[in-house]
Every structure is written in C-alpha cells, then in structure tokens.
Curated annotation (Swiss-Prot):
Entry's transmembrane regions: none
The encoding gene: kdsA
Catalytic activity: D-arabinose 5-phosphate + phosphoenolpyruvate + H2O = 3-deoxy-alpha-D-manno-2-octulosonate-8-phosphate + phosphate
Compartments where found: Cytoplasm
Keyword field: Cytoplasm, Lipopolysaccharide biosynthesis, Transferase
NCBIfam families linked to this entry: KDO8P_synth, PRK05198.1
Gene Ontology terms for molecular function: 3-deoxy-8-phosphooctulonate synthase activity
EC code: 2.5.1.55
Family membership: Belongs to the KdsA family.
Domain of life of the native organism: Bacteria
Protein name according to UniProt: 2-dehydro-3-deoxyphosphooctonate aldolase
Originating species: Legionella pneumophila (strain Lens)
Amino acid sequence: MRLCGFEAGLDKPLFLIAGPCVIESEELALETAGYLKEMCSQLNIPFIYKSSFDKANRSSISSYRGPGFEKGLSILEKVKSQIGVPVLTDVHEDTPLFEVSSVVDVLQTPAFLCRQTNFIQKVAAMNKPVNIKKGQFLAPWEMKHVIAKAKAQGNEQIMACERGVSFGYNNLVSDMRSLVIMRETGCPVVYDATHSVQLPGGNNGVSGGQREFIPALARAAVAVGISGLFMETHPDPDNALSDGPNSWPLDKMKQLLESLKAADEVYKKYSTDF
C-alpha cells in the first residue's frame, strides 16, 4: 500500500506513527515533530506525526481534551508545512471531516467507534489513508468486517491497528496472535505499543499505565511481523496532559527504535510469512 510517499506492507521496512497523545501547545507540537523527523531520518524509518486536537473519550469530565478543532487543526497544518512531515489525527462522529481531510494526511478512527458502520464509512469516503483501531472488546477475526465496511466506500488505503484487549477491569493485554489474524485482511497491520500498556480508568477517574512494558511488547510485535508501529511519546511523560503513564520518553525513542529496526530487519530477512 502506498502511504505518505512510501510503501507500507509486511515485506516493507517498518514505519513509525508517533507524537504526543494530545496537542498541548504549538511549541510542543513543533518541537516533538522536529525531533522525531530528524531521528527517523538518521535511522531511515518512514515517519508520520500524530497528535489529537480533541480527545473525546477521556475518563473524567475534568480531563484535558485538547485545544479544539480550529486551533488544533491550525497547529497540525504548521507541523506539516514547517517541519515537512505527514500528519495523522483521530476523528470522531461530529468532526468536520472535509476540513480535517484538507489538512491531514491520515485519518484515524478511535477503538471505541470501530463498530459504528456509518462513522467508519464516512471516514473511509474521504479517500484518505485510514488507521482503524481495533476495539478493546473486539476479537481480531471480527476486524475483517470493519475493514470491509471501509473498503465498500472504494478506499483501499486502510490499516488495521491493534491496541490491546480488555482483560478484566481496568487492564489490557496484547494477544500477539491478533497481529497474524488481522494480516489476513490484506491490510497493513499497525501495533500500538503505548496504548497497549494502558490501565483504562484505573486510577480514580484517570487512566494509568505501565510504561516499563512498552519495549518488550514492541519487540514482540515486531518479531511476530507488523507493517507499522504506533507510539505516543512526550518530552516529559510524567507531566503530560493526556496518557502520560503510557507514553514513552522522547529522549529514549532513538535507542528503542534502533533495536526495533534491527529486529524488523531480521524478521523480514528470514520470515516465510510473505
């Protein structure tokens, strides 16, 4: 699949979707995008910047949701034009899709909305690449039906993203078999290594997370075989305004990605999966 100027697929080099969970400020967005662009250029990893202008599914009414549509989209436009990177953002049922699609390169549908047929089809109809996150409640073999809804709009630029599955209350686990199963859809499979360590709503109305497990799960996913990696990162995760406990420190990204790139190259050299 052609994606933002590069080829995405199981037999292609690993690509990265990364950035802060939510847009906190223009300065932070430009800083992180510039840092990640330079790092990925050095490592020769295709890169897409991500951040959200509205986190509509925060645990608490008092949680920071973002700068809103107009300001957030303006910041993403500056990231794209000033830093020179493709951008991804998530959209919701009330998002003005035409306006967002005029700026961003990739649309993302939230996990909680993956079963909303009208929503999935409206997003796919924008004819932009779409990263569809698998719901925490959904079996991996059910993703073929979600993908079919999107492709029924004539859009073949669809990705399937694994972000963990509910395991009791306030806990997620990663079933690596799901990566293999979702590959059967024929879509590039992306692994979200940061939301997969989230503890949803488990901290008195605020989601917690187990950041220390991000490297292990990311390495496991790369070893199983994926097309892309999704990671939320922040210069100061402990003070991030959203999803800090499951964000990876920006200054540790390069070291982690060096090991993941090496693992991806080994997998793609010896794999019989393609």
